[in-house]
Amino acid sequence: MKTALAAAALCATVSGAAAETMLHLSETATVTVAPDRLVAVVRAEAAADSAASAQDQVNGLIREAVALAKAASGIAVATEQYNVWRLEPKNGAPSQWRASQSILLHGQDGPTLLQLAGALQQHGLAVESLGWELAPETARSARTEAENRALKALRGRADGIADAVGLQFDGYRSLTVGSAPPGAFRARTLAAASLAAQSEPSAEAEDVRVDATVEADNGLKPR
């Protein structure tokens, strides 16, 4: 675990007739977690003399891709943005239309998803991006662990500083806990040549950092 000190301040405040010593501290803790969910974005694209023809081709590719994905155990699939646009003609050539749509695939069984991505490539789709991330439940657990570590470190520092100045901890006067989102979708964009790939893609997992920061005004009192 890595921790980092953000700020520390000791001051005396007056509440009624009694003076109270306030200690402001901030502490950050980091946990490192192995990602456990593979995410891929796969795109179908086609060009034709008419918008309808281009869309028909894309629709067929997407239907086939979704069917293959649903047949793969443990893989979730969702269709994404659909685009149709006209290509400006050049040198007197007839105009063309292009259509595209992407699908999002994710699952915790990496080999199965990679095999599926390879099969979709063979059916004429392109793998746009591929990467590992934390599943939601894993991210929540890591965030809780980071927060608990930061809180423990902050309380330990508060006790240590209080003892050094002849006082003792007397509770939090304010407490803020914040967590940065874990390293999102560590994707890599693949070249257009992936359309014609003869083997399934690969994706190496890299550990993800999850940070949590706590900030508190700590009341101190005489021993």
Residue ranges: model-predicted function:
Residues 2-3, 8, 15-223:
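Short, charge-dense linear interaction motifs
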